[in-house]
Regions:
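Short linear motifs embedded in intrinsically disordered, charge-biased segments
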Residues: 1-188
Length: 188
């Protein structure tokens, strides 16, 4: 008899399956470093990944903030330690514009801190990325999405991943702009 959690709107209930496993109902939970919520979406996950990246950045600030260290070395350390934490598990996210802006905004703040530059200096974020020899966080996410898409495409057609990818949900959509699908994120 297993015990687990499932994210649903009705918090506090227990769901019991036929085999006797019990699932506690919660509004959100962390699974493999990714936040899953009852409402869906990736806003909570992107916030958590950003906080984790800032924690990692703060751990390395004594080195990344030094003036005597070359920018290329800072860029390599940032890319391997901080940026990798920020984009962990993001290849499956279907992000909204606000989520993308949150990640970019936080990355730009870290880059300015590393380079010792303020917004008053009027140096673009692209220029800072060039100085540090790093890709932007959204380009890294796009590359990892394409890599993951390749894995999914090579799966056998009767695999559950392929079935989920081809799944079409019946019913009527709510009002407003439709949610962006993961496939639409890959195609852009």
């Amino acid at each position: 008899m297993g015990v687990g959690v499932v994210a649903v709107e009705e918090v506090g209930k227990e769901i019991v399956m036929k085999d006797g496993s019990k699932f506690e109902c919660v509004s959100k939970f962390c699974y493999l470093g990714d936040m899953l919520t009852a409402a869906g979406g990736v806003a909570e996950a992107s916030i958590v990944r950003t906080r984790c990246a800032w924690k990692q950045f703060q751990n390395l600030i004594s080195f990344l903030g030094k003036r005597g260290v070359s920018l290329k070395l800072k860029g390599k350390l940032y890319r391997s330690s901080v940026q990798s934490v920020m984009v962990y598990a993001s290849e499956t996210w279907a992000m909204k514009v606000g989520d993308e802006q949150r990640l970019e905004r936080n990355e730009n703040a870290m880059l300015r801190w590393m380079c010792g530059v303020s917004k008053k200096d009027r140096i673009s974020s692209k220029e800072l990325r060039d100085r540090l020899s790093i890709e932007g966080v959204l380009e890294v996410i796009k590359r990892s999405r394409l890599r993951w898409f390749g894995h999914v495409e090579r799966k056998e057609k009767d695999d559950w991943v392929s079935a989920c990818r081809e799944l079409e949900v019946d019913g009527v959509r709510g009002r407003g702009r439709p949610m962006k699908t993961w496939r639409e994120c890959v195609n852009t």
